[in-house]
Amino acid sequence: KNKNTMKNYLVAVIIILQSNTKKYNDLIEKYQEKIKKLQDSINDTYDDNEKSNKQNKNWVDYNEILKLLRKMKKDTKHLLEKPIDELSNKEKDLIQQYLVHYLYSGKAFPIVRNDFAEMKIVNEDDELDDDKNYFVIRKNGLPYFQLNQFKTAKYKGEQKIIIKDLELRKLINKWAKINNTGYLLINITTNTPMTANGISKYLNKIYKKHFDKVISTSLLRSIYITNKYNDNLSQKQKKELAEDMQHSKDIAEKVYNKID
């Protein structure tokens, strides 16, 4: 097991033991000490900014991510021009793979987590829940992603990602008509919204096929940030990038920016 997984297991055990702190106090203290040591060890790895063996094995250069985007654009061009009722599920899936890769390529905006899960496509005058994420279409002005539910929402509040990228806007508009469910991403077979776990599996499928590697959202974020930091960003630019990616500059430098 990796250290983060072990730490999470121990936290879960402590929560159970805390139902009777009098009886299990010594055990709780013992596990808390183990958690502290594991966290120190995790932080040491972060401080070294070294790629783990798993990251090294699955790492791809950021230019390869962009090259794949160009390839997928070319491969799906004829499909996007086909009448919608003539598209097979396999062809729809190829279009959605292109969209998902676009969303996680960092080309249109800095890479976020699995926040597109179960995301509804809505109009700006629709009533929105404050615990769900949306793709908002506007009568005037650019559409945007409204993120109310994400890992650091508690600290950062609602986030809006305005879609300035014309190509992505056109792709989403076309895809919304093709899938016709009212959701941004779907399970093609069941026509149901894609879950966070579904996004992880979908990304794995895409990158296994094209790179023969297992690339998660977290690894994509590392690849993206490492490439950005190679451009010698100013402290202000690093802070802005961290805000866009919904974490702190410190986390970006310690956790995501990787050196060989």
Give short role names for the model-derived ranges.
Residues 1-35, 218-223, 246:
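Non-catalytic DNA-binding core/recognition domains of DNA-processing enzymes
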Residues 6, 199, 252-253:
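Helix-turn-helix DNA-binding helix
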Residues 25-85:
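Flexible interdomain linker/hinge and immediately adjacent N-terminus
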Residues 67-114:
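Basic, Lys/Arg- and aromatic-enriched nucleic-acid-binding interface segment
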Residues 100, 117, 217-233, 241-242:
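Short, basic/aromatic-rich helical patch in the C-terminal catalytic core of site-specific tyrosine
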Residues 118-163:
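Conserved tyrosine-mediated DNA breakage-rejoining catalytic core shared by Y-recombinases
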Residues 160-220, 224, 229:
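Active-site/catalytic core of tyrosine-dependent DNA strand-transfer enzymes
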Residues 213-214, 233-257:
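Short, polar N-cap/turn motifs at the start of nucleic acid-interacting alpha helices
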